[in-house]
Amino acid sequence: MTTLLSLLPLLLVIALLASGRVSALVAGLAGLAATLAASATLVMGNAPDAGGTDAVAALFRREVPAGLWLSWHVIAIVVTGVFFHRANQARAVAGSAGTIEATPRRLFSGCFLLAPFAESVTGFGVGYIIALAALRRLGIGGLPALLLGLYSQSLVPWGALAIGTTVGATLAGLTPNELGLLCALLQIPIHLLYLALYWRFAREAGLAVPLAQKLDDLAWTALLLGLVWLVNLASDVEIAAAAPTAFLLALRYWRDERPGLAQAQATLRASAPYVALTLALCATRLVTPLRDLLKPLWALKPFDNQPAFAPFYAPGFWLLSIGIAVVLIARAPLGRVVAETARGAWRASAVTLAFVLMAEFYVGSGMATAIAEALRGAAGRGAALGVPLFAATGGFLTGSGAAANAMLMPMETALARALALDPAWMAAVQNSVTANLTMLSPIRVSMGAAILALSASDAVLYRRAWPLALPPLLTGFAAILVLLARA
């Protein structure tokens, strides 16, 4: 009975999302309601006589504030990230349109550097929008553009300044840097497999990549992955993708375009908000005196097992500040930008709140542990092989690393402990696979089809795109097999 009650909310969410008839918000609210009812029932049943009501009240008093606090960290970046993007849209820099010659070097920069950079600093598909715009400038459209545009999501474990990784780390009992470092190692085989598929997609788009350029692509991919790992090790996880992609993008621009002074100045003006944001985030995390000043300044930490919130150190402060400056300099109507932000951010914020609260109650009520024990009893150590499938399903259905981690991380880390496996690596598999599979979520694919005005059916789109699921899934299964062999 305990296992069935514990599973019902998860199964309900998966069934609702898989049906395609309800949104992630409706599924999240239904899952939260079912979780609250199931956790209250189990806590009352386990409490001594006449003490059930008090136990349920204590559970709610403990988990609701904790869930709201963890949600706030995500929502603060959701709202400010959308505001930053809308501010740049309002800026409407002249001269950003027009087509340019398509070359393999420009295609690589757009797919693996420019678009992932945009996704890492704002998230929520913004990188995909920028990727499609860049591909159209290269004269690539239709289904090939949709497939290549999905590479904007190739560093999503660090997307939106790593909010999904931060949520996953908190629920797994790790620091964000610890989880980010493990995910950076898993991203190496994932990215190399992505690269092999990219060459095929580029050829199908009419832009075959010669051997010399493939070697060049490999070298830059190795450099990118090495820098992502290094930044995870030496700095904060929030900039682990933003800083390397920005640095390499500037380096590639200088090498490939050899711009004159006027062209370089025009490019700098067009990208000034992103340059300012990257410099601000890097300075506050790499310049020791500045970091030591801002990190404790007015910091709030109401829960010992949850991250602190330092308002002047948080990425959202810089997204908001630079976004406001962009609006004021462009003399755009601030009220309109705020209204567009509210319309664009409220749903993602509500989805995050529902799934994070659901996760808190799964942990606090013991339901995650109950499911893990049941899986161990039913499948033994082989139950661990289900983790990549759970993670892939969560990422595909929700389209959000934060939401999928909130839904699944408590159960999977509990399973790791029940099987005497390393919970940190189990958390890394969950986070890496679920984040990478968000690129194939119906939310992303339908967005690309709408922007490109594709008339092809979903079946046709997924028949071409499904190989992109293989790199994270194969890596996830391989990692679990290594964990089982070492245990």
Could you tell me what each predicted segment is?
Residues 126-136, 163-174, 402-415, 444-457:
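Re-entrant/interfacial helical elements at transmembrane boundaries that shape
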Residues 103-133, 143, 157, 352-357, ...:
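Hydrophobic alpha-helical transmembrane segments of multi-pass integral membrane proteins
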Residues 74, 86-92, 117-129, 155-162, ...:
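Short helix-coil transition sites and intra-membrane helix breaks within transmembrane domains
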